UniProtKB/Swiss-Prot annotation:
Protein name per its UniProtKB record: Flagellar P-ring protein
Keyword Signal belongs to the record: yes
Organism: Shewanella sp. (strain MR-4)
InterPro entries: Flag_FlgI (IPR001782)
NCBIfam families: PRK05303.1 (NF003676)
Role description: Assembles around the rod to form the L-ring and probably protects the motor/basal body from shearing forces during rotation.
Signal peptide as annotated in the record: 1-20
Similarity comment: family membership: Belongs to the FlgI family.
Keyword terms: Bacterial flagellum, Periplasm, Signal
Length: 363
C-alpha cells in the first residue's frame, strides 16, 4: 500500500503541466549571494554541564590573559560551567555594518548541554580570514539532558546546539559586482538549455531585441544601465517577468534505503516482457542421539539430519507495449504486487535491456 501511495503521488506531481514562473523564482543574480562566517568561542554560565578538556582550559586561560589576568603555568583551573564552541552564521548580500545576524552555536567538546549558557564575544571570520561580524549573547537551546544518580540519562532533541537570534553585529560589508559593469547575469537554479533560451526570449520581448542572450544552460546575460538606482529599478522589472520552464528530462529516481521511487512524466518503455519471482531456500537442522544397548560394546554418538526445502514464488509475466507511459508503468508495478526492492531490480533490468527510456538514478 505504501509503494502504491508513493508512486501515485510521484505520478501526480510529475504529470502536472508546466506553469509560468517569475524569473526571481527560478534564477539568481550572479554575484548576489550570502557568505558563510565562522568563529571559535567560549560559552560560560553553564549549570555544571560544561567540560574539563585541556583545550577548554587553554582557551579559558587565554581569555583571562586578554583581561590582564595571568595564571601560573602549571595551574589547571577546575571549571565545569564553560564549554568551547563553534559559532557560525550566514551573511546575506547587501547587509550593512550595524545590522544584526542570527548565529548558531555548537559544542566542540564534551559539554553535556549548552542550556542556560552565554556566548562571550566571538569574532566571526569569512573565508578570506577577515572579521565581518562579532557575536555575543544568551543561547536559546530547545533540547535538554538530565542525569540520574543511578547512571540513568534522559536526552531530548540536541542540547549541545543553540541559537542566538540577532546575536551578531555586522562590522564589515562584502563588496558585490552588482553595481559594476554593463551586464547583469542570471543563473538558473536548474540548468536547462531550453529554459535559458525561453528566459532570454521573454526578456527580449519586453525590452527589445538583443537585450538578453543565453550564455549556456545556466546563465543568461542581460544588458543593464550603469546608474545604480536605474539598475535596481531595471532588476525589479526583470525578476517579475514570467517564464515557462522546460519539461524535465526523463528520469527515474530510486532511494534504495527508504524504498521511495519517483518516476518522471517523460519516462517511456520500449516493448519488453517482465516476470519477477523470488526463490526461497529453507535449511532445518535436527540433532539426534544414538544410544547403544546397555550390554553392547558401543559408544553414544550424536548425528545431525538436515532438511532442505526450496520454493519459488510464481509471478505473472506482463508486457510493455511501445511508448508505455508513466500511468501504465505504475499500474503494471502495482499489478504484480512488487515490493520496493523488487521494483528496483525490475527497473535496473529494464535499463540494462535498453527498454527504459530515461535516466535511472539511485540515491
Amino acid at each position: 500500500m505504501k509503494l502504491k501511495l508513493i508512486l501515485a503521488v510521484a505520478m501526480l506531481a510529475f504529470s502536472l503541466p508546466s506553469q509560468a514562473e517569475r524569473i526571481k523564482d527560478i534564477a539568481n543574480v550572479q554575484g548576489v549571494r550570502s557568505n558563510q562566517l565562522i568563529g571559535y568561542g567560549l560559552v560560560v554560565g553553564l549549570p555544571g554541564t560544561g567540560e574539563k578538556t585541556r583545550y577548554t582550559e587553554q582557551t579559558f586561560t587565554t581569555m583571562l590573559k586578554n583581561f590582564g589576568i595571568n595564571l601560573p603555568d602549571n595551574f589547571r583551573p577546575k571549571i565545569k560551567n564553560v564549554a568551547v564552541v563553534a559559532v557560525h552564521a550566514d551573511m546575506p548580500a547587501f547587509i550593512k555594518p550595524g545590522q544584526e545576524l542570527d548565529v548558531t552555536v555548537s559544542s566542540l567538546g564534551e559539554a553535556k548541554s549548552l542550556r542556560g549558557g552565554t556566548l562571550l564575544q566571538t569574532f566571526l571570520k569569512g573565508v578570506d580570514g577577515n572579521v565581518y561580524a562579532i557575536a555575543q549573547g544568551s543561547l536559546v537551546v530547545s533540547g535538554f539532558s538530565a542525569d540520574g544518580l543511578d547512571g540513568s540519562k534522559v536526552i531530548q532533541n540536541t542540547p549541545t546546539v543553540g541559537r542566538i537570534p540577532n546575536g551578531a553585529i555586522v562590522e564589515r560589508s562584502v563588496a558585490t559586482p552588482f553595481s559594476t559593469g554593463d551586464y547583469l547575469t542570471f543563473n538558473l537554479r536548474r540548468s536547462d538549455f531550453s529554459t535559458a533560451q525561453r528566459m532570454a526570449d521573454a526578456i527580449n520581448d519586453l525590452l527589445g531585441p538583443d537585450m538578453a542572450r543565453p550564455l549556456d544552460a545556466t546563465s543568461v546575460q542581460v544588458s543593464a544601465p550603469r546608474d545604480v538606482s536605474q539598475r535596481v529599478s531595471f532588476l525589479a522589472t526583470l525578476e517579475n517577468i514570467e517564464v515557462e520552464p522546460a519539461d524535465e528530462s526523463a528520469k527515474v529516481i530510486v532511494n534504495s534505503r527508504t524504498g521511495t521511487i519517483v518516476v518522471g512524466q517523460n519516462v517511456k518503455l520500449l516493448p519488453a516482457a517482465v516476470t519477477h519471482g523470488g526463490l526461497t531456500v529453507t535449511i532445518a537442522e535436527a540433532t539426534q542421539v544414538s544410544q547403544p544397548n546397555a550390554l553392547a560394546n558401543g559408544q553414544t554418538t550424536v548425528t545431525s539430519n538436515s532438511t532442505i526445502n526450496a520454493s519459488e514464488s510464481n509471478r505473472r509475466m506482463f508486457m510493455f507495449n511501445p511508448g508505455t507511459t508513466l500511468d501504465e508503468l505504475v499500474r503494471a508495478v502495482n499489478l504484480v504486487g512488487a515490493a520496493p526492492s523488487d521494483v528496483l531490480a525490475i527497473l535496473e533490468a529494464l535499463k540494462v535491456a535498453g527498454a527504459l527510456h530515461g535516466e535511472l538514478i539511485i540515491i
